Amino acid sequence: KVYLKHIVNGQEVMMDSAVVKNRCFHFEGTAPKDVEAAIITGFDNGSAQLLLEPGNIKFKPFDGNFPVGAKAYGTKNNDIFVGYAMLHSKNADDAKVNIVTLRASLPDSITNDDRKYMPYHGAIFNANGVYYKADVMDYYLKHIDSEASLFILKYDLYYMFKPKYLHDVFMAALPERLHSHPIYK
């Protein structure tokens, strides 16, 4: 059995359950008024995340042994989140390439001496962080008219910027219609 849950006041609350047959399961019902984050649990190794909204939400690739690797798609906001997950992967890959490129550009006398190498590594680490923040901000602004932008704000931008900057820049940029969403409040 698997369970569809959402978080209410920090607690997982079950919304529905389904029996797994032939490695498939199905939930059917009325979506909440506001798009909300949900999880599917009941697996041995974690859960799968999704944004609960009207439509036919599917997962790919879905492996019960590694459910956290599955991405929800098939609806506007879940498709935006798939793109967001790909952005995370791309940034991680780019960061690795940047570090490898840096190491290859330095003489052995620096790369073999941690004291000499650490300032270079620290600089590329910080640069990778700036590139990541810039990409997140760009993606957020490209999708600012969607409810998914609220979740990007909550799960990523919230940890990157001071509250005043978050409010004055990112929240102020949101369309008026999203101001009534519970996450905005």
Where are these predicted regions, by residue range?
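Conserved functional acidic sites
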Residues: 139
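Alpha-helical repeat scaffolds
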Residues: 132, 136, 163-175
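Amphipathic alpha-helical repeat scaffolds of TPR domains
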Residues: 145-156
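Short coil/turn linking the two alpha-helices of tandem helical-hairpin repeats
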Residues: 157-161
